[in-house]
Amino acid sequence: MAVSAQLVKQLRERTGAGMMECKKALTETNGDIDAAIELMRKTGMAKADKKASRVAAEGTLVVSISDDQKQATLLEANCETDFVAMGDEFQEFAGKTVELVRAKAIADVDALLAAEYEAGKTVDDRRRELIAKIGENMALRRFVTLSSQDGIIGHYVHGNRIGVLVELKGGDAELAKDIAMHVAATNPIALDAASLPQDFLDKENEIHRAKFEQSGKPAHVIDMMLEGAMKKLFSEVVLLNQKFVKNPEQSIEDLLKSHKATIIQYVRYELGEGIEKEETDFAAEVMAQAKGQ
């Protein structure tokens, strides 16, 4: 039978399940909402939905990259514990999903969840199966795909917890990977000073000026002190101004010039960003690893 949008809406309101799951259950039960709920409980969908409110701050970051390094996708998949995150089933799910995103040029998470994972099963179907089987909430939180016509995409993943993609014009694969590792370690705010958010600049100017004015020095001296403070700040938060972690005698800008290369764009994900959880300084781990190479 044809399932009306109103029936699907009612079932979603009662179960919290996704639209496709509700439509499928209603179709199989000829529009009987109570029977559909019972069916969803039997198949694990209802069990999965009960876990949907639990915080999934652990997980993994995975990358799919084309053989010619012209295209790459970075995806964050979440679960509740590190134990499950390292399990074969979760890793297989994340790995197959990121490949699907890149191969099908999927645009957003909603489209990904509705995409075919395997014959007769969507990505969200598989996600809910794993939730029901393993007993933890799981989510496909975000992903990004970079493509390059004239350059290459470099990538670096640290411990499945920090992931970086870098689009580089000029240079080679080794340089692209080095830049990606550097971004993982230093977490720059912007590629160049001109790209820094104006509200960030205004706030930093205000803070430093207020501090320097307490010295009682003349205005022109305070202006010089402020200029120096902002220059130091740029060396810390602007990618091109930062010192290369593998060679602190050289800035990223100088490194690029020596290879006649240009960074077009970069993306950095850190697992669980914005999710309330116990923090671990994985960036410091990358920094130590990079300096040791």
UniProtKB/Swiss-Prot annotation:
GO-annotated molecular function: translation elongation factor activity
Keyword Zinc among record annotations: no
Protein localization: Cytoplasm
Keyword Protein biosynthesis recorded: yes
GO cellular component terms given for this protein: cytoplasm
Superkingdom, natural source: Bacteria
Family: Belongs to the EF-Ts family.
PANTHER family given in the database record: ELONGATION FACTOR TS (PTHR11741), ELONGATION FACTOR TS, MITOCHONDRIAL (PTHR11741:SF0)
Biological role stated in the UniProt entry: Associates with the EF-Tu.GDP complex and induces the exchange of GDP to GTP. It remains bound to the aminoacyl-tRNA.EF-Tu.GTP complex up to the GTP hydrolysis stage on the ribosome.
Protein's recorded name: Elongation factor Ts
Protein species of origin: Dichelobacter nodosus (strain VCS1703A)
Lineage of producing organism: Bacteria, Pseudomonadati, Pseudomonadota, Gammaproteobacteria, Cardiobacteriales
Name of encoding gene: tsf
